[in-house]
């Protein structure tokens, strides 16, 4: 679809692998190139973080790019830890995330992924959000990718993200849902260009 690869700004090898896999599937594969750019990260919602990061990355790289921010919101805690999940996980681990909900019957949570796309320097990033509902469970499966071992999506047939084969996870994940919207947008833009 694209004449040159789309730049994904991340230093996270697991995210890069998933994004490449998801965007290369289907009838209009999108080739991804990685750039790890050290950018300051503001505190805010996933939308605010992704948009700011994308704007800065496009300026630094001088080209079109995508950035991502994720969140895990516990419904009993009114959406916390949300975009700060990375810090909660680093400080508390999987067991600590479960302990946060020990006093609540409601263990439901939403996994949220927000991608921002910028056509290049000086353009306002466009936001694509994906959301997958599920619940927080004691860790199951390999604990190698963030909080995957404690998140059991409703559509996961009783498996955590970590227990799922990647091809199954990548059909229902929050990341897949956001990237599917991004793919549709990029295809529509490519069609406009061809018809001009």
UniProtKB/Swiss-Prot annotation:
Xref: InterPro entries: ITPase, ITPase-like_fam, RdgB/HAM1
GO CC annotation: cytoplasm; nucleus
Domain of life of the native organism: Eukaryota
Example GO biological process: deoxyribonucleoside triphosphate catabolic process
Assigned EC number: 3.6.1.66
Family annotation (Pfam families): Ham1p_like
Locations listed in the record: Cytoplasm; Nucleus
Keyword Magnesium attached: yes
Chief localisation class: cytoplasm
Catalyses which reaction(s): ITP + H2O = IMP + diphosphate + H(+); dITP + H2O = dIMP + diphosphate + H(+); XTP + H2O = XMP + diphosphate + H(+)
Keywords, comma-separated and alphabetical: Cytoplasm, Hydrolase, Magnesium, Manganese, Metal-binding, Nucleotide metabolism, Nucleotide-binding, Nucleus
Binding site for ITP: 10-15, 53, 69-70, 86, 145-148, 169, 174-175
Cystine pairings recorded for this chain: none
Cofactor: Mg(2+); Mn(2+)
Residues annotated to bind Mg(2+): 41
Subunit composition and interactions: Homodimer.
Function description: Pyrophosphatase that hydrolyzes non-canonical purine nucleotides such as inosine triphosphate (ITP), deoxyinosine triphosphate (dITP) or xanthosine 5'-triphosphate (XTP) to their respective monophosphate derivatives. The enzyme does not distinguish between the deoxy- and ribose forms. Probably excludes non-canonical purines from RNA and DNA precursor pools, thus preventing their incorporation into RNA and DNA and avoiding chromosomal lesions.
Family membership: Belongs to the HAM1 NTPase family.
PANTHER family, A to Z: INOSINE TRIPHOSPHATE PYROPHOSPHATASE, INOSINE TRIPHOSPHATE PYROPHOSPHATASE/HAM1 PROTEIN
Entry-linked NCBIfam families: RdgB/HAM1 family non-canonical purine NTP pyrophosphatase
Record protein name field: Inosine triphosphate pyrophosphatase
Organism phylogeny: Eukaryota, Fungi, Dikarya, Basidiomycota, Agaricomycotina
